[in-house]
Amino acid sequence: MSPLLPSFPPAVLALADGSIFPGYSIGAPGETTGEVVFNTALTGYQEIITDPSYSRQIVTLTYPHIGNVGVNAQDAESDRIHAAGLVVKDLPKRVSSFRSEGALDDYLTKAGVLGIAGIDTRKLTRILRDKGAQSGAIVAGKVGDSYETLVSKALELAKAFPGMSGLDLAKVVTTQKVYEWREAEWNLHGADGKPAYGTLDTGKPINKVVAYDFGVKRNILRMLTERGCQLTVVPAQTTAAEVLAMNPDGVFFSNGPGDPGPCDYAIAAAKEIIEKGVPTFGICLGHQIMGLAAGAKTLKMKFGHHGANHPVKDLDTGRVAITSQNHGFAVDANTLPDNIRVTHVSLFDGSLQGLAWKDKPELCFQGHPEASPGPHDIAYLFDRFVELMNAASKKEGE
């Protein structure tokens, strides 16, 4: 028998291995497919589902109560929900937050995104941990629909999804036009005494930075702006020649979804920009792009890193930082060229987390120093990028 609640439409999550999870719909009706992953963050569900890096992924949140504080426009990391679907244990119907502008289920429904609640997320997470991330599908029906019909359709869809390997999604989620960004970090006590985002402080030294948008999160742009970066955001397929013609002090390669391997346009651009010696910083997919541009290889991880409690060791200082992570691919440390050194490693599995070039002003990091959600222990990497740009400018002036 299905444990569906009579007042909610029925929904089913199916995995490619045949696992079935009946529950109830908390979003739009219909069907969706994607790679099913789990995220261990306790907070930040709105930031997670609006992160473009989750494109074509069905996100399982391991924390049991999701939706407590509702949603609001300020916490979105992009202009829409990018996750293919959302899986939670329990959706509280009472929202409690002075910042809330609506409920999570309404947010999903208006965006046309499927969600399922009422399932055993602990069991699901253990399957994904032991067997690895899997193709999956959510099918959400109407009140009174047959549970058996939903199951057969969900299984069919789950087994048909090809997985994330080989998918170039950066050019799918990227901006379609060049734009300027001037919004800085959130301040509980803004200019008028009310919570608000800051703006670029033109009274301080400014660095002109071109940011490649492979699926960039807004909080990354805010943290760069907070540090005096005057940002020009460009589409993923912008050539190195176009970027270099802007005469930037630095170049940033953003986070993003999918497999870095097929992004040959980005790899070629990164290689040319790095060879020119322009200070460059990459995060997440941008980190992988820079690694590939240097001649290293990437690999698909078993279930990836998705959460806000991942310990990472800085090999230069010995310091351990708790970081936010969201990636299913990683740079293979065994394939690095001699001119690159490893700067950070994961204390969960020893995987490569950070790189620096020995002969050029370049660095990159696999995790998310901007967090959102998560800790800011590793935010000093933004400062290092600014230091690289300042040092390069000083050298040019000598």
From Swiss-Prot:
Q: Which Pfam families match?
A: CPSase_sm_chain (PF00988), GATase (PF00117)
Residues covered by region (CPSase):
1-204
Question: What does the record give as the active site?
Answer: C284 (nucleophile), H368, E370
- Provide the catalytic activity annotation: hydrogencarbonate + L-glutamine + 2 ATP + H2O = carbamoyl phosphate + L-glutamate + 2 ADP + phosphate + 2 H(+)
In this chain the Glutamine amidotransferase type-1 domain maps to 208-395
Q: Which domain of life is it from?
A: Bacteria
Name one molecular function that GO assigns to this entry. Answer: carbamoyl-phosphate synthase (glutamine-hydrolyzing) activity
**Function of the protein:** Small subunit of the glutamine-dependent carbamoyl phosphate synthetase (CPSase). CPSase catalyzes the formation of carbamoyl phosphate from the ammonia moiety of glutamine, carbonate, and phosphate donated by ATP, constituting the first step of 2 biosynthetic pathways, one leading to arginine and/or urea and the other to pyrimidine nucleotides. The small subunit (glutamine amidotransferase) binds and cleaves glutamine to supply the large subunit with the substrate ammonia.
Question: What name goes with this protein?
Answer: Carbamoyl phosphate synthase small chain
Please name the source species.
Polynucleobacter necessarius subsp. necessarius (strain STIR1)
Question: Encoded by which gene?
Answer: carA
